[in-house]
Amino acid sequence: MSDKPLTDVTFSSFDLHPALVAGLESAGFTRCTPIQALTLPVALPGGDVAGQAQTGTGKTLAFLVAVMNRLLNRPALADRKPEDPRALILAPTRELAIQIHKDAVKFGADLGLRFALVYGGVDYDKQRELLQQGVDVIIATPGRLIDYVKQHKVVSLHACEICVLDEADRMFDLGFIKDIRFLLRRMPERGTRQTLLFSATLSHRVLELAYEHMNEPEKLVVETETITAARVRQRIYFPSDDEKQTLLLGLLSRSEGARTMVFVNTKAFVERVARTLERHGYRVGVLSGDVPQKKRESLLNRFQKGQLEILVATDVAARGLHIDGVKYVYNYDLPFDAEDYVHRIGRTARLGEEGDAISFACERYAMSLPDIEAYIEQKIPVEPVTSELLTPLPRAARVPVEGEEADDEAGDSVGTIFREAREQRAAEEQRRGGGRSGPGGGSRSGSGGGRRDGASAGADGKPRPRRKPRVEGEAPAAAAQTEKPVVAAAAAQAPSVGMADAERAPRKRRRRRNGRPVEGAEPAVASTPIAAPAAPRKPTQVVATPVRAANKSSGSPSLLGRIGRRLRSLVSGN
């Protein structure tokens, strides 16, 4: 990025399809950003591109223009069926795929192109029906698309003439590289297919992928004075763990009304921080892997509309999402990866705007700071944690935004969101027949929890009796239960026998599990009546003979004894 995010190059100066130019102008795009001005002269004639540019520089529009212009100006491959896609755009995360699809529809709705958005976490059958009907462009995450290609043969990529890999470095981080190679092998060979690759960093592994599956790609790098956005004002505080929430509330109270994102490292802290902010009167949304996909989309949409003041998220929202007007980004937890820091603060100061990036370096995550400063090649200014900042200012009455009343009635509180998420996850695990929690699941606590703590429901809906571990040589449980009354009655009438007869019954070995005796693994009940115990015999006392006493009573004295007697005889003169 630079202080001048737009160049003097206009989209109309390129040989674009007239309908595409009209769509760009109607969407408000007239001049190119640096990455767009570098990419389009290479991509429009059909060349492969390996582009490096930071987030928020307009990479999405660069490859969307190249894809749509190719599909509008060039005929499809000869062996293409009407339902086969002509272009594939791959993104590492669902949120990024949704954002790309939204931008594509924004200025490409009137071009006659059919778009399909494919990602996990939503209705599988609806996406399959859409693909079977036929589309021109698929915008997808690798996992769900491979499921359609590999397992169900829903879609074929043999006629895909252009492929885009967005955030390629993130693909490696998330372990998608094998999936990417699998999909590229199902497309036309690289001499026929055009491939556009974009990444925040063109590392060795990214370039290796480019040269392996691309046709002599041209490496394009947007030179910047700094890796981070020039208009981001960065500062860092060093609070203790106990001061972080109070400091966050104090800083938020001094920036009332500003659209804010708060990043944390774990899903558990998303819920904890969001609950704290909600208790203090803030309207909060959450983005993490625990939140269902539909709810994530709804919360993100409300945040973009201004119905939510703060969005608390993990790194799932750190890349690719373009949210207008984000003024503050808080790193509540410093990220472990320096690149994640750059992508987090890239949510603000996009396309020439200004913003603030505020980080907390507590004792738990402060060790990441040297790597971050080395990566961005600058020292982050340090601000002191004062008692004034730890005191939140009184909040002014907030003017409600249109649509907030309906959302309040829907009950989209943080607690409700996570409770519904846990219930939905438990229901899905039960529906799949597995899982360690929920009814019938196998949890060690709760009613109906599994073998140890409760019985699962039978075919008639009634709870089954708990099944005891079977011991080797033991009769079946049902037979043993039916014999218990008979055995008890016979035992009462049986004559007494000696203890020796009772001891002749075979002993059953007690099985052990994980070093602990299995509960209920007692010796099996004999099929014959159990004899009543005989009267106890008087115990026999066994007296051990001391060793020295035994030596004294023996006929042969010890060596020391013989020496002693010899000395005494010499002294006495005998």
UniProtKB/Swiss-Prot annotation:
Alphabetical GO biological process terms: RNA catabolic process
Subcellular location: Cytoplasm
InterPro entries: DEAD/DEAH_box_helicase_dom, DEAD_box_RNA_helicase, Helicase_ATP-bd, Helicase_C-like, P-loop_NTPase, RhlB, RNA-helicase_DEAD-box_CS, RNA_helicase_ATP-dep_RhlB
Entry GO MF terms: ATP binding; ATP hydrolysis activity; RNA binding; RNA helicase activity
Biased composition (Basic residues): 506-515
Location of the region described as Disordered in the Swiss-Prot/TrEMBL record: 423-574
EC number: 3.6.4.13
Compositionally biased residues, Basic and acidic residues: 423-432
Sequence motif DEAD box, residues: 166-169
GO cellular component terms given for this protein: cytosol
Record motif Q motif, residues: 9-37
Domain Helicase C-terminal: 231-393
Keywords annotated in UniProt: ATP-binding, Cytoplasm, Helicase, Hydrolase, Nucleotide-binding, RNA-binding
Helicase ATP-binding domain: residues covered: 40-220
Biased composition (Low complexity): 477-495, 523-535, 553-562
Amino acid composition bias (Gly residues), ranges on this chain: 435-449
Top-level EC class as recorded in UniProt: hydrolase
Major site of localization recorded for this protein: cytoplasm
Positions contributing to ATP binding: 53-60
Reaction it catalyzes: ATP + H2O = ADP + phosphate + H(+)
Similarity remark: Belongs to the DEAD box helicase family. RhlB subfamily.
Complex and partners: Component of the RNA degradosome, which is a multiprotein complex involved in RNA processing and mRNA degradation.
Task performed by this protein: DEAD-box RNA helicase involved in RNA degradation. Has RNA-dependent ATPase activity and unwinds double-stranded RNA.
Protein name: ATP-dependent RNA helicase RhlB
Species of provenance: Xanthomonas oryzae pv. oryzae (strain KACC10331 / KXO85)
Gene for this chain: rhlB
